[in-house]
């Protein structure tokens, strides 16, 4: 699931910008949940390529 979100964010950077600015939230998720997901994405995106592994 997270890899799908990452691919989506990479394909639609304007959506990611709106989510980061709290102008929108992911369907089915609260604004707090969306913020947590965006933080996880940012942490993943800023991490070293050798540490980019998801448990799920």
Swiss-Prot record:
Q: Which InterPro entries match?
A: Competence_ComX_Bacillus
- Example GO biological process: establishment of competence for transformation
Molecular functions per Gene Ontology: pheromone activity
Describe PTMs of this protein: Trp-54 is modified by farnesylation, which is essential for activity. Modified by the tryptophan prenyltransferase ComQ before export to the extracellular environment. The type of isoprenyl derivative differs among the different pherotypes and depends on ComX primary sequence.
* Major site of localization recorded for this protein: secreted
Query: Keywords on this record?
Result: Competence, Lipoprotein, Pheromone, Prenylation, Secreted
Which compartment or compartments is the protein found in? Secreted
Check the record and name the Pfam families matching this protein: ComX
Which residues are part of the propeptide segment? 1-50
> Which Gene Ontology cellular-component terms appear in the entry?
extracellular region
Summary of subunit composition and partner proteins:
Interacts directly with the sensor histidine kinase ComP and stimulates its activity.
Note, other: The DNA sequences encoding comQ, comX and the N-terminal two-thirds of comP show a striking polymorphism, which determines the specificity of the quorum-sensing system in the different pherotypes of Bacillus. In ComX, the sole conserved residue is the modified tryptophan essential for the activity.
- Its function? Part of a major quorum-sensing system that regulates the development of genetic competence. Acts through the activation of the two-component regulatory system ComP/ComA composed of a sensor histidine kinase, ComP, and a response regulator, ComA.
Q: What is this protein called?
A: ComX pheromone
């Amino acid at each position: 699931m997270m890899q799908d979100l990452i691919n989506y964010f990479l394909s639609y950077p304007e959506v990611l910008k709106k989510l980061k600015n709290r102008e929108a939230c992911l369907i089915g998720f609260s604004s707090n949940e969306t913020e947590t997901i965006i933080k996880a994405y940012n942490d993943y995106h800023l991490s070293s390529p050798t540490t980019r592994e998801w448990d799920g």
